[in-house]
Amino acid sequence: ERTPTDLYLWLVKYQKELSHQFGWEIKPSSAIEGLAAAYGNRLIHRWKRLKNQLFPMSSSQPPPVGDWRKTHLVPRKEGQIFSSILVGINGKDSGWRALEQALIIAQIENSAVRGLHIIKGEFDPSDDQIREIRAEFRKRSAPHKISAKLYLEQGEVLNLLNERARWNDLLVFSLEHPPKDRPAARLRSNLRGLIQTCPRPLLAVPSPSPMRHALLAYDGSPKATEALYLAAYLVEHWGIKLTVVTALEDSTSRHNPLHKAQEYLASREIEASLFSDVGLPSDVIISAMNKRGCDFIIVGGYGYQPVMEVLFGSTLNGLLRKSEKPILICH
């Protein structure tokens, strides 16, 4: 039977092998989660005692509701929840907007930014286009005086973003192609797949924002409650202003989820503006954002079972199509 010391030494070796193989700086806790994803629960059970002693709990993909919060919203040694931010770099204006947003957050949180440019086929690192992307990344990152590094990898975009997100705390990406409002389009949507399976919170960026006034879209669901917890953290640690909105089916509805949100925020002594309106949820949320001057949205991830979401759509899909401000997606 291996001792905790033996297991720890093996983990350190595995962490170094991963870092050498992929060229990424990987935290021990992220290496453990990588083992879970690769080899399943049986191997990870052997780590349980050591993990409880040394690292936050983590689990294999797909993440259960609340798993990220239990790992990141408890006090961490670094004193931050987004210590490392992954941002997809596509070499287009949309990708540079996503980088700008990641840099804004990194300055608030004192985070490191890791850009990832994914190439589907074979590539030459000395190619003119790649050199231009590297140069542009350095030019845009340098004025912020934070740790920023660009990685180049070959593979399928969705899979690589998911895998590398596990080694970071937040995934930031450009919002170029939101799911269209048709079942067949939703079924084929890579963005939908990314949001459903990503092990970390995601920030979809149509255009950058200073992120000073959040609109929390709250319906009382488990994932919306996770968004509520994150919103409370941002108020307390970033000093943002918070507005909470709920969409009701009709004006006679007896149950209003805002009561639960108000009770939680009051327990944390957090001030927020709360209101509800009747209508299609995505329309109510976008209208509230515009009227209240909010500069980003916080929302829970997909709430339906996959088949139901494909057939009937979701509030999140509507927001991804309609919002001109960043959307922070929690699960």
Where are these regions (language model features)?
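N-terminal positively charged helical leader segments and presequences
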Residues: 112, 122-151
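Class I S-adenosyl-L-methionine
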Residues: 20, 134-138, 142, 232, ...
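Residue-level detector of anion-binding/catalytic polar loops
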Residues: 25, 112, 147, 170, ...
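Small/aliphatic-rich secondary-structure junction motif
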Residues: 70-127, 197, 209-276, 284, ...
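Gly/Ser-rich helix-loop-strand patches that form or flank binding pockets
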Residues: 57-72, 101, 160-208, 289-331
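A structural preference for short, hydrophobic beta-strand core positions in alpha/beta folds
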Residues: 115, 149-152, 204, 244, ...
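Charged docking surfaces used in two-component/phosphorelay signaling
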Residues: 152-159, 277-282
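Regulatory N- and C-terminal appendages and interdomain linkers associated
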Residues: 1-59
